[in-house]
Amino acid sequence: MRDLRVTLAQVDQVWEDKAANLRHFEDVLAPVSNTDLIVLPEMFQTAFSMNGDALAETMEDSETLRWLKRMAQVKNAAFYTSFIVRDEGRLYNRGVFVEPSGIVH
């Protein structure tokens, strides 16, 4: 049985600025290699915010989910994190596990 290699990324975030946070995490993760799982903070792309109405995305049209899928493929590692999702009119802090293949759980 081989070891599970996990990378934890706990960094300062830019309050409610998705684009800045996605760029920042891409820079932070640039040197990361040879890992199986990358765990990002809760609500990593906005920092923990109660402004869900303005920041929520749908799973079907999520910039954040597209970014996670791309990064999982680039890093050949699974990602776990959460972000604000609007589903059937309600808001959720939804945890997602993204495989390098692009499958989302």
Language-model regions, residue ranges each:
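General secondary-structure edge motif
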Residues: 1, 5, 51-52
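Glycine-rich anion/phosphate-binding loops
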Residues: 19-24
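Cys-nucleophile CN-hydrolase/nitrilase-fold catalytic domain and related Cys-dependent amidase chemistry
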Residues: 27-100
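Active-site-proximal beta-strand elements of phosphoester/diester hydrolases
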Residues: 3-13, 17, 94, 105
